[in-house]
């Protein structure tokens, strides 16, 4: 690591500690040339897979798009923001765990429905009605019947 004071290349780590519930490392470093001390933080870079849309267009994963879709389904429902964040983190973890560089949007939609089903059945039906393009009341009834099984 370059020294921010004299830009020398040689620095040594004096102390390392986990911070942020173990999600990052704080390091105290000392320059071997000018002896100045400074702090660095290291965080793992978690790369999300690209999304393959139904029309075969590929685009970067967009967490805001995922969040807004879930929040739209959960609008005016008694679900806490913490529960929504936990569900989003679970979906992202599952996507990373595939190890794939690209995932179909259908997989993401199914993961969202899985999480919504656990959070709130009404939100699940709202999302499923759009995601699966329900065309009449019969489609709603069939999905509700599946929920009750």
UniProtKB/Swiss-Prot annotation:
Annotated organism of origin: Salmonella typhi
Cofactor(s) the protein needs: Zn(2+)
Cofactor note: Binds 1 zinc ion.
Gene Ontology MF terms in the entry: ATP binding; DNA binding; zinc ion binding
Described function: Negatively regulates transcription of bacterial ribonucleotide reductase nrd genes and operons by binding to NrdR-boxes.
Family (UniProt): Belongs to the NrdR family.
Zinc finger (unnamed): 3-34
BP GO terms, sorted: negative regulation of DNA-templated transcription
Disulfide bonding pattern of the chain: none
This protein's name: Putative transcriptional repressor NrdR
Keywords carried by this UniProt record: ATP-binding, DNA-binding, Metal-binding, Nucleotide-binding, Repressor, Transcription, Transcription regulation, Zinc, Zinc-finger
A Pfam family reported for this protein in Swiss-Prot or TrEMBL: Zn_ribbon_NrdR
Domain called ATP-cone: residue spans: 49-139
């Amino acid at each position: 690591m370059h020294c921010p004071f004299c830009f020398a290349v040689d620095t040594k780590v004096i102390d390392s500690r986990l911070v942020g519930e173990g999600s990052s490392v704080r390091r105290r470093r000392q320059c071997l040339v000018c002896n100045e001390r400074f702090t660095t933080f290291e965080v793992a870079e978690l790369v999300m897979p690209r999304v393959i849309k139904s029309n075969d267009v590929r685009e970067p994963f967009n967490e805001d798009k995922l969040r807004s879709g879930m929040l739209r389904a959960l609008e005016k429902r008694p679900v806490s923001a913490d529960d929504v964040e936990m569900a989003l983190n679970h979906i992202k973890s599952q996507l990373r765990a595939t190890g794939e560089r690209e995932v179909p949007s259908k997989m993401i939609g199914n993961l969202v429905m899985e999480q919504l089903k656990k959070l709130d059945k009404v939100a699940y039906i709202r999302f499923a009605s759009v995601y699966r393009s329900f065309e009449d009341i019969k489609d709603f009834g069939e999905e509700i019947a599946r929920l009750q099984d």
